[in-house]
């Protein structure tokens, strides 16, 4: 009996394995025979499997395919580690892509593919969550001027600890990513929860561990696990996320409870922070219902913690680009002088970050060269009858679409010498005042996709741009940093582009 059961288990397991390994070929067969493929058309099940497995090694298929097809206004398909192919549209079809309604091409369904929450937390209501994200980040953007004093206070505190306090003028070697991690997390937690929690080492530890574990599991399940295995692997991968959710609920529950009481009684003015905005929104949506604190905390952790790592990576790329640029061009000094003037002439009626066009252009250039994903504008075909593209190509329901962002950003038809780092590329001159001006960092277009484009552009991009300008400007004004000999090459994991995490820099406090 035991032997028979074992044999049945082996047969079922073998059948499942064969099915999983055949999935790349099934994906190929779903698409029209006229579809172009990069780097080659799968010639059979083993060929499709090999092309999919190749993507695990950080292949730049989307960028190379862009050069071969998209520059000729042709779409193409590539295999993925998830064993489900993706169709990449040329830039000429971006306006059409953005014009399609949600019930035809779904951004939300594609978003589920990217963050894998339906697999990691099946009971999580993603649609209510997305509405909350938009509302909360609107509050965050609107309150940028009101939070600048707290921002600068925490910026001074964290940089003193990490890079050196006034009077400490000795050169020191620090890990760039670790330093930015401490500075940026400190600032964000100060704005989200206030000074007491932002400097509570145990709380900060749990926040960082939760962020890293959740981000890693999202990337792993969404981009590296074959799609038939996602439901099972996702549930297992979600266990550590639930554990840290419980730890964070224990820490944050008293703060949320106190804030609910404050807003309901209206006896005191609550702090202008993320907790207040979130509780206020929850109460305004359902004035007569009880606010479920644990649910709010779970949503908050996803809204504000995970994007902090994105901000760290963008700032990391900025410094890697700047420090590896030609010292003779004196980009560092030009940005320092601009930042010194902005901080010295601070006008409390508007953010400091509004008076730094050179910084604006330099950040935008780093985002152009190093977006954090090689594909943007993801959509999933959800219309039952499929969809016909502007060039007449038909795609069945379930097809995953995107645009090769790195290819768009490095297209010589749009950008002169696109592979060259030109930090002041986006500068121009005001025709009336003759002063320098720059395209704002958060402004998206069909040629600049670092934050996406259209109505689903990253809702936190205005705060991210403001934060980067203040943090970078303050560091440039107060610290000397030795140049890097060459720019460390970013890594590619699935569709995600990650800066090198082990780069050491030499830094000292200025007199």
Swiss-Prot record:
Heme binds at residue 458. Its EC number is 1.-.-.-. Pfam families: p450. It is an enzyme of class 1 (oxidoreductase). Pathway: Secondary metabolite biosynthesis. Keywords: Glycoprotein, Heme, Iron, Membrane, Metal-binding, Monooxygenase, Oxidoreductase, Transmembrane, Transmembrane helix. It comes from the Eukaryota. GO terms for biological process: secondary metabolic process. Glycans are attached at residues 175, 200. Induction: Expression is regulated by a complex signaling network which may include cross-pathway interactions mediated by sensing of the cluster final products or shared biosynthetic intermediates. It is a single-pass membrane protein. The chain crosses the membrane at residues 9-29. Coiled coil: none annotated. The keyword Signal does not apply. Its cofactor is heme. One of its GO terms (molecular function) is monooxygenase activity. PANTHER family: CYTOCHROME P450, P450, PUTATIVE (EUROFUNG)-RELATED. Cytochrome P450 monooxygenase; part of the lna gene cluster that mediates the biosynthesis of diastereomeric piperazines. Lna and lnb clusters encode sets of enzymes that produce overlapping sets of previously undescribed metabolites such as piperazinomycin-like metabolites or morpholine. The lna and lnb biosynthetic pathways appear to be part of a signaling network that controls the formation of sclerotia, a resilient overwintering structure. One primary function of the non-canonical nonribosomal peptide synthetases lnaA and lnbA consists in the reduction of L-tyrosine. This is Cytochrome P450 monooxygenase lnaD. It comes from Aspergillus flavus (strain ATCC 200026 / FGSC A1120 / IAM 13836 / NRRL 3357 / JCM 12722 / SRRC 167). The gene is lnaD.
